[in-house]
């Protein structure tokens, strides 16, 4: 029901072609990578696209498909920037229905939810915040044995800077 609800949100905003594209991406990723996930291994994927090309919308579709297929918890990483983290959190709240949506200060909400609804936690890539949430996950009995689906919405911040590397 999560993917269907998300696609309806997109289509209701008048963007039927985007909804169709998201559906196709989510189905492809779901069938090729999520359906046979062992829940014991680590899988890494990459969604490529130009700046402002709709990658976040496609990523939301993949999250919804994964929730439909039984994944209970998602961490959505943003750049270590308060404004970007808040913008992403607000977009998740506006676009994705039926999830327990948490910001970095919502550990109580996450714990109270106990994965009754799939949870999406939107976090900055900040060591202090990530350690805090690692402790939250480790201390809750309900996360034990459950997969955590981690999505990096700002992979440009995932690599080391090449500003001073001598490249032209």
Language-model segment annotations:
Residues 1-168:
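RecA-like P-loop NTPase motor core of helicase/translocase proteins
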